Amino acid sequence: MRPKVAFFDFTSCEGCQLTVVDSLQAHLDLLDAVEIVQFREAISERGEDYAVAFVEGSITRESDEARLKQIRERAAVLVALGACAHLGGVNAIKNLAPLDDVRKYVYGVKAEWYATYATRP
C-alpha cells in the first residue's frame, strides 16, 4: 500500500511546491511510490487522510498556527519543505522591525484589518 501524502502551503511564494511539481513531471515513477491526496498546486482533490504532510511557508498568523497543529495531529510524519518552513524565509525580514511599523508600511491605512505576528518557521 502506498503512503498517502499531502502538501500544504502557508506564507510563501509557493516556489518550493512548484519545484516538487516539476520534479514529479521529470520523475513520473515517484507517483507510483505514493498516493497524493492533497496538493493545491497539482490536484483539485482535498483528502484529509494522509500519513505524510509536507508543509511549505512560514507561520505569520494565529490561524496558520491552528491549521498547522491540525495538520500535525493527522500526519504520522510532518516535513518542513523549503526555507520559509525551515527558517522563516524572506518573510522573516519583517521580524527586524517593530511589527506595528511593518504592518503600517505593508497595509497602510488598512493595517488593522490584517491579523499577523512575527514570522515563525
Protein language model features and the residues they cover:
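Iron-sulfur-associated redox domains of electron-transfer enzymes in respiratory
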Residues: M1-P121
